[in-house]
Regions:
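N-terminal leader/signal peptides at the extreme start of proteins
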Residues: 1-15
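N-terminal single-pass transmembrane signal-anchor helix
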Residues: 12-46
Length: 315
């Protein structure tokens, strides 16, 4: 009987403190190995989803272009000078990114959710949840929700309903040649935003929130969409795929980015290039443009002195 009792006591014996500590140490070790891998997998998933959203936005523009002889959507062509729908001069004052995305949202070419990156880190960038479709009344010369509290916003200093930078919409050579369905695989049209004025050194680079969107925290990473609707992921504001400027002499670009007399293009900066008279606005540029550079409704079709510095918000 005594032997049976001792046997039962041995069978009911639990883990010792040492054994529990060993198990906990093993679990901690496994978590230490798995968590970085899980974090990397989640970051990769966000980057891929972000890439898909950039592609969808541009596809929406291309679909809209089918109704406009191949011209990508331009707010000033949707809401023209005068009150007759579809007629009149282009209203250049309307041409900013808030109106661009607001008009596409109002016409159903995009939805509010895909306008904000899944990797967004700026608290001022949020989906437009208040857009009022009932405000759209073409008969009253209203083509998107213009409401101060409900309409689509694109101002990183106050509130932006989009994460993505886009080609400026001002009347320049750039717009004349590329704001249409060109299928140009070397012209950047849309993508993740970058450091202020294309900075690659100094505080404007190292302190930029855009370094935190993808990849690590020390260098810029992002998805860039081209006018043929292909997307590339890279770690430089000088993508090799982007067509370089004509010559290096008047480009203002870093000397180490001059290759065979061609200056590589910074997609977050309005590079000069060697155009006649030192004109700008022929290269790929991606910004978030809060207002038009025009103070009047009509403007020249080749406003190539435009710099954009007063009409763009950063971070």
């Amino acid at each position: 009987m005594r032997n049976t009792h001792m046997k039962n006591r041995n069978q009911n014996k639990g883990f010792t403190l040492v054994e529990l500590l060993v198990v906990m140490a093993i679990i901690a070790l496994l978590l230490g190995l798995l968590l970085p891998a899980l974090a990397k997998a989640r970051a990769t998933a966000r980057q891929v989803k972000d890439q898909t959203q950039v592609k969808q936005i541009h596809q929406g523009w291309l679909t809209a272009a089918n109704d406009s002889q191949g011209i990508l959507p331009l707010p000033g062509e949707i809401n023209r000078v005068g009150a007759v729908p579809g007629r009149g001069d282009i209203d250049e004052i309307q041409n900013n990114h808030g109106n661009l995305h607001g008009s596409m949202l109002g016409r159903g070419y995009v939805n509010a959710q895909i306008m904000v990156s899944p990797a967004e880190i700026n608290a001022k960038v949020i989906p437009c949840a208040t857009y009022n479709m009932n405000m759209i009344k073409p008969a009253s010369d209203v083509y998107w929700d213009p409401g101060a509290g409900t309409g689509f916003k694109a101002d990183l200093l106050i509130q932006s309903n989009t994460s993505y930078s886009t080609m400026p919409l001002d009347p320049t050579t750039r717009r004349k040649t590329e704001w249409k369905n060109t299928s140009n695989s070397r012209f950047a049209i849309l993508g993740n935003r970058g450091p202020k004025a294309g900075a690659v050194t100094g505080d404007d680079y190292t302190n930029s929130k855009t370094l935190l969107i993808h990849g690590g925290t020390k260098e810029w990473d992002g998805n860039i969409g081209y006018n043929d609707n292909h997307i590339e992921y890279g770690r430089t504001s000088y993508p090799e795929n982007v067509k370089p400027l004509a010559q290096a002499a008047c480009s203002g670009g870093p000397a180490d980015l001059v290759i065979s007399t061609l200056s590589q293009d910074n997609i977050f900066k309005n590079d000069t290039g060697c155009q006649t008279g030192g004109k700008k606005n022929v290269d790929s540029v991606l910004w978030i443009q809060k207002t038009s550079s025009n103070t009047t409704s009509t403007g020249t079709t080749t406003l190539d002195i435009y710099s954009g510095s007063d009409f763009v918000t950063w971070d």
